[in-house]
Amino acid sequence: MSERREEERGRTGFSMKKNHNSNFNRRNQEQIHQKLPTKISGPLTLEQLCAYQHMFRIQEISSIIKSHSFEVPNARNRSPSPPPVYDAEGKRINTREQLYKKKLMNERFKLVEVVSKLIPGYSAPKDYKRPTTFQEKYYIPVSQYPQINFVGLLLGPRGKTLRKMQEDSGCKIAIRGRGSVKEGKTSSDLPPGAMDFSDPLHCLIIADNEEKIENGIKACRNIVIKAVTSPEGQNELKRGQLRELAELNGTLREDNRPCATCGQQGHKKYECPHRETFAMKIICRRCNQPGHTIRDCTSDSNYGKQIHSSRYNNEMPYHRTSTAVDQPSAYSRYGYTPRNHNGSSRFNDNSKYLNNGNKRATPQPELELETSHKRQQINPTSSSQDTLSHQTNHMTMTTIEDSGIDKLQLPAGMSNENPIPQPVNFNEIQINDVSGPNGTLEAPPGLDLGNNDSNITLQGPPGLN
């Protein structure tokens, strides 16, 4: 019954015809094959041996493609067949023979590229046509790391990262597979092949040579590795993409702007270590350092020495807070003088008490010479003829110690009662004796040195009365 049904359906003749064609191809294959010698008698170097093996395999593949004798491996040795794919006319384009032929052609292309580099001047087989495009798939580990947005990292802000990868590698990179298309997109909005969700998420890399394919795979792998290995929040690639996106949207807040307080970069104004606080405005009057008062000062320097730099009064030995005592004229308006007022301040320079009645923190030494000296003011006689007498009207004598005044040897004309000599009147000076030195020195004409008369007259030149 089964043989009869096969004859009715016409399958018996088809199977016989198929077997006849296979036998014919086998006989033709033996004639077409130009077998290269497999036994090499002469010595060859390692490079020559490698080149010969490549040439042998290229010739073998060319003969198989030319004879159309594609021997599909057994079911145990071949991979599972992919789902069938049909073209616009309804013909299947991914049969086992077609897939095997495509595999052989790719192998021959790689071998021709290697041999052309090893052997200069090598000519490929006549039926060989170099493919214009190559493509490869790089699968992304979405199932292992579902929390990472690989598509966003590969695309970048408005596709800038993907375009940069394509420019650097020289190939075309497209994201395909499940999860590569946003919801709401249709096939009319996307390029052909983008709606194919049969494969998992992957990068489709297309180029004109193998080197560019490898560069594209390496670029995609680097981004995936960086996204997987970087801790959360420390991915520099993602930070750069967010910054570029803010620049494109016009919402970027520049982080490299200098601080308004110190003018340096790297921190905000509220994080500035040099910002002025309330404590920085307080200046210690002892050490002139900001941040504390005199009570909290830990400086070992002398208070009396540091107080001279006070901005209130550099001459006061203590810190004075009241300014009313510096204005004695304020009391004169009311016609009275306060008690213990000496004209400049209600406290003497040698006072041991401050304004608040407390004793001085640092005692000041008293003047040692104040009790042992006498202050004496001398009013010299005025004279309108001498400049020296005019200057002495404003001169006051310093203190002279009583115990040492007797031991001093005063010059002539100076006594203890009148320490400053009287002014000299040069009009009263008389010449008693004018004599020349011993020797033969002669006086000028008209001058007689031997005459001791005080009425000496000088004679002028001849002709002058």
UniProtKB/Swiss-Prot annotation:
InterPro entries, per the entry: BBP-like (IPR045071), KH_1_KHDC4/BBP-like (IPR055256), KH_dom (IPR004087), KH_dom_type_1_sf (IPR036612), SF1-HH (IPR032570), SF1-HH_sf (IPR047086), Znf_CCHC (IPR001878), Znf_CCHC_sf (IPR036875)
GO molecular function: mRNA binding; pre-mRNA branch point binding; zinc ion binding
Location of the region described as Disordered in the Swiss-Prot/TrEMBL record: 1-22, 324-391, 431-465
Cellular compartments annotated: Nucleus
Major subcellular site: nucleus
Annotated Polar residues bias: 339-361, 377-391
Cellular component, GO, one term: commitment complex
Zinc finger (CCHC-type): 257-274, 282-299
Comp. bias (Basic and acidic residues): 1-11
GO biological process: mRNA splicing, via spliceosome; regulation of mRNA splicing, via spliceosome
CDD domains, per database record: KH-I_BBP (cd02395)
Matching PROSITE patterns: KH_TYPE_1, ZF_CCHC
Function: Necessary for the splicing of pre-mRNA. Has a role in the recognition of the branch site (5'-UACUAAC-3'), the pyrimidine tract and the 3'-splice site at the 3'-end of introns.
PANTHER family according to UniProt: RNA-BINDING PROTEIN RELATED, SPLICING FACTOR 1
Record-stated family: Belongs to the BBP/SF1 family.
Protein name as annotated: Branchpoint-bridging protein
Organism whose genome encodes this protein: Candida glabrata (strain ATCC 2001 / BCRC 20586 / JCM 3761 / NBRC 0622 / NRRL Y-65 / CBS 138)
Record lineage: Eukaryota, Fungi, Dikarya, Ascomycota, Saccharomycotina
